[in-house]
């Protein structure tokens, strides 16, 4: 999946929203406080509402420019990257990419089919999330 979106908010604001969300998720999973400076390279286990578990690894962070994490389950590995480009003092462009690597040929085939069918839905949802973040900027 690949999506680029111009937002009416500074790059620093959107970056901080992404990091705050990540820190909230991490702190809920490990039951202790973690600062933004500590998240690069951090790994933790997350249990989803469905009961499935995944290991989340914060791969890279570059202040106001990049946030990348890897989600690993028993059958798939997702790498999600948010690149933030400052366009002006009150506008930025966010490019989100997600790659999926499945373990096994049948899963890879299934991912190709479902990705083609459901990819638009995922992009639509991501647009809503990014727009909601930008809407909180004043």
At which residue positions do the language-model features occur?
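A short, structured loop/turn motif at beta-sheet edges
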Residues: 8-12, 59-64, 83-93, 137-138
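Hydrophobic pocket/interface hotspot
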Residues: 14-18, 58, 69, 94-96, ...
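Beta-strand elements of well-folded, non-transmembrane domains
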Residues: 9-11, 50, 100-104
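Short, highly charged C-terminal tails/helix-capping segments
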Residues: 31-36, 130-138
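Short, surface-exposed coil-to-beta transition loops
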Residues: 1-2, 51-56, 77-81
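Short beta-strand segments that buttress and anchor functional surface loops
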Residues: 42-49, 67-73
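Hydrophobic ligand-binding cavity/cleft-lining segments
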Residues: 1-38
């Amino acid at each position: 999946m690949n999506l680029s979106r111009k937002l009416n908010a500074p790059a620093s604001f959107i970056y901080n929203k992404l990091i705050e969300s990540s820190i909230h998720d991490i702190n809920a999973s490990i039951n202790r406080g973690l600062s933004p400076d500590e998240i690069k390279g951090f790994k933790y286990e997350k249990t989803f509402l469905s009961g499935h578990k995944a290991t989340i690894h914060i791969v890279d962070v570059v202040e106001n420019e990049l946030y990348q994490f890897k989600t690993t389950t028993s059958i798939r590995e997702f790498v999600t990257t948010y690149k933030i480009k400052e366009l002006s003092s009150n506008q930025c462009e966010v490019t989100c990419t997600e790659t999926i690597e499945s373990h096994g040929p049948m899963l890879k085939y299934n991912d190709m089919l479902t990705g083609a069918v459901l990819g638009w839905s995922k992009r639509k949802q991501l647009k809503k999330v990014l727009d909601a973040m930008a809407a909180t900027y004043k």
